[in-house]
Each structure stands twice: as structure tokens, then as C-alpha cells.
């Protein structure tokens, strides 16, 4: 497995130390390490993946450096517009290193909402013309692949995607935990809301934990 510290340090050695994105369960150890070890201004958690791409573009235009945008593959569709209108080689030709957690990979059991997205993850990258590689799960292989990605971006100014499979990164536990004094948990809040609506009312919720709890 690849230690989060190793991954972040290899990128730093290549001159990459700015991150924007939407946290993902497959990337949780990387996200935790970045949160603990980088200033807040170097790790921007965006409202959505398209917004993260916009932030990354602004960072590159201001510094000339390559940013990282991290996401779950379920957010891949959200980057199509900023990619096609800003970063693509036919427009402004701006390099962004995409780190994409591959939920629902064919042949790997996952929750139903990830199945279709898992099937089309690589196809979407091909359609957008984004070069990519599946990050090796050993540190030597990962380091070599990161260098290939960075060399490609420096030579072409194009985006490059590192696709992350399950169990690629070693465990890292977040140290800088923010303690809040909120009185209710998510589960309790959902229970209160659900118990106070009409029996024949329709509840629309997101895929994932909230729908499971309902």
C-alpha cells in the first residue's frame, strides 16, 4: 500500500503542493493527511468538483504551478464543463492533476449507486481526451507513475488523471479533529424530520448514508 505521507511528499518533490476538491471515502486517508500537514489555503474543500476545477485554474494562472483536484468518480461529470471550457488543450491548455477515487469498479462489489459510474469512469476520461493511469498500490510503482504524470503535464500543459482503486492508500487517522458542540447527530436529525411529516409525504434524499438511514 501507499502511505499518504509518501504520496504527498512525492508530489511536493515534483513542485505540486496545492489541493482542491471534494473528499471521497477511497481518498479519506490522503485527505486526512493533507488536512493535518498543509495550511488551509493549500487545501480548499470545494462545494462541488466543477468548483474545485475553477479554483485550480485560478491557482495555476496566479502561480504557473500544477494543482491537484481530488474527487470521487461520482463527481467526474461535474468537471466536464470546466475541462471543456477552460483547461482543455483546445482552449487555455491548463494542466491539472486529477486524483479520482474509483468506486464501483467492474468486478469489485460496491453500493448500487456506484455501479454505473464505475463502469463509465475510464470511458469518460477517454471521451474527454484526458490521459490517465491507475495508480500502482506499491510505493515504488506509485512514485514512477507520478513522475510520468508530472513529466507529461510539464511537456504538454494538459490534464492528467490518477485513478485510485480501493485499498491503494495506507491508513492515516486525522489528528486535527474539530470538536463541535452540536446537540444532535445526523441520525437523530433525520429521525426527528421523518417523524414529523405526513405519512403519505414523499421524502427525497441523496444516495449514500442518508438514504440508508431513512
PLM features: residue spans?
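Thiamine diphosphate
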Residues: 1-122, 126-130, 134-214
Amino acid at each position: 500500500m501507499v502511505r499518504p505521507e509518501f504520496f504527498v511528499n512525492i508530489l511536493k518533490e515534483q513542485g505540486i503542493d496545492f489541493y482542491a476538491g471534494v473528499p471521497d471515502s477511497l481518498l479519506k486517508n490522503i485527505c486526512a493527511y493533507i488536512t493535518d500537514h498543509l495550511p488551509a489555503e493549500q487545501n480548499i474543500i470545494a462545494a462541488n468538483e466543477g468548483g474545485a476545477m475553477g479554483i485550480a485554474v485560478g491557482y495555476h494562472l496566479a502561480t504557473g504551478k500544477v494543482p491537484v483536484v481530488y474527487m470521487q468518480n461520482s463527481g467526474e461529470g461535474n468537471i466536464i464543463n470546466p475541462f471543456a471550457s477552460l483547461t482543455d488543450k483546445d482552449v487555455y491548455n491548463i494542466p491539472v492533476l486529477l486524483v479520482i477515487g474509483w468506486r464501483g469498479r467492474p468486478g469489485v462489489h460496491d453500493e448500487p449507486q456506484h455501479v454505473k459510474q464505475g463502469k463509465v469512469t475510464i470511458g469518460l476520461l477517454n471521451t474527454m481526451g484526458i490521459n490517465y493511469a491507475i495508480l500502482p498500490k506499491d510505493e515504488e510503482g506509485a512514485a514512477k507513475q507520478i513522475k510520468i504524470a508530472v513529466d507529461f503535464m510539464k511537456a504538454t500543459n494538459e490534464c492528467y488523471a490518477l485513478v485510485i482503486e480501493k485499498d491503494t492508500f495506507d491508513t492515516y487517522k486525522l489528528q486535527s479533529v474539530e470538536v463541535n458542540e452540536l446537540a444532535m447527530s445526523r441520525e437523530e436529525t433525520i429521525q426527528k424530520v421523518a417523524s414529523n411529516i405526513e405519512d403519505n409525504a414523499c421524502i427525497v434524499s441523496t444516495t449514500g448514508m442518508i438514504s440508508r438511514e431513512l
